[in-house]
Amino acid sequence: MTITGIIAEFNPFHNGHKYLLDQAEGLKIVAMSGNFMQRGEPAIVDKWTRAQMALENGADLVVELPFLVSVQAADFFGQGAVDILDRLGIDSLVFGTEEVLDYQKIADLYTEKGAEMEKFVKNLPDSLSYPQKTQAMWKEFAGLDFSGNTPNHVLALAYAKAVAGRNIKLHPIQRQGAGYHSVNKDVDFASATALRQHQKDQDFLERFMPSVALFEQASKVIWEDYFPLLRYQILSNPDLTTIYQVNQEMAVRIKEAIKTAQSVEELVELVTTKRYTKARVRRLLTYILVQARENVLPEAIHVLGFTEKGRQHLKSLKGQVNLVSRIGKEPWDAMTQKVDQIYQLGKPSIAEQNFGRVPIRIETN
């Protein structure tokens, strides 16, 4: 049987995600971000709600990406997620993208010339941002051009790099309907960005979200809910360079900007430069919010939920893969668990995220 992996945030889960799961074959394993997203923002609803949405709409098994995989630039995000899915035995990776190319060929190219390609990136001037360097590399070695707004394509290339040399086939699915950042309401498939923006528009949600009741019942947060905490962390920390990935230049800019910024968005605007993209600045602010430090990634994989089919697969992995289904006295990943406690501070109504929580079981699919 085919075992298909999907890397996702489901922030929130919408019809485009359901379409992706419908297109996937065999047993479907989702490696999903926890409570903070790749581009450095809190999830609109918590990881358990999002895992349940996925399980109700075609996923067989949902596992959690640790914080230091979730909140990373595309390459590290892709690498960390593929590592986890590889250990869970996937033989194909399905993903949505704006550009359907022969990503398999790109993965093979990276298998062959990876060292040379990384050397090329290293030698590019530091005035370029990391995404610009990566794009220059793909242009040079694969002849790829980038139109501005294709974050899923950028992630797809990161997945191609991550599967290089592994026995995993890539299956791109043409992204349906609205673009990633689109807030357009007159489309067949709305983007997660639009759903977050129109979260109080009942008709809109019902049109584009398969698990709308779950979403409506859940506590919802936005970055601004954490702004007072973020300000406190910045103002009270005498040396921001002790925080993961914060260098001297960024520390100075952030300390200066917090004097006048009245919101997270304003802070991001003030700190962003040509070299430091908004997404990168948001990630740094997330690291500061949670006091992130360089840390080893957990050995074990945290299971958020499964169907009967998913449970059978987990049974077959017993003894080969270290799985955690209940976080108790033994932590799974101390960093992620601390992050979840901070996530809960965004709204008093957010439930406990780890202790005593057991995987969600969906009986029928």
Swiss-Prot record:
GO molecular function: ATP binding; ligase activity, forming carbon-nitrogen bonds; tRNA binding
Coiled-coil intervals: none
EC number: 6.3.4.-
Reaction(s) this enzyme catalyzes, per UniProt: cytidine(34) in elongator tRNA(Met) + acetate + ATP = N(4)-acetylcytidine(34) in elongator tRNA(Met) + AMP + diphosphate
Disulphide bond pairs: none
Localization annotation: Cytoplasm
Binding-site positions, ATP: 7-20, 96, 152, 175
Record GO biological process: tRNA modification
UniProtKB keywords: ATP-binding, Cytoplasm, Ligase, Nucleotide-binding, RNA-binding, tRNA processing, tRNA-binding
Cellular component, GO annotation: cytoplasm
Function: Catalyzes the formation of N(4)-acetylcytidine (ac(4)C) at the wobble position of elongator tRNA(Met), using acetate and ATP as substrates. First activates an acetate ion to form acetyladenylate (Ac-AMP) and then transfers the acetyl group to tRNA to form ac(4)C34.
Annotated family: Belongs to the TmcAL family.
Protein name: tRNA(Met) cytidine acetate ligase
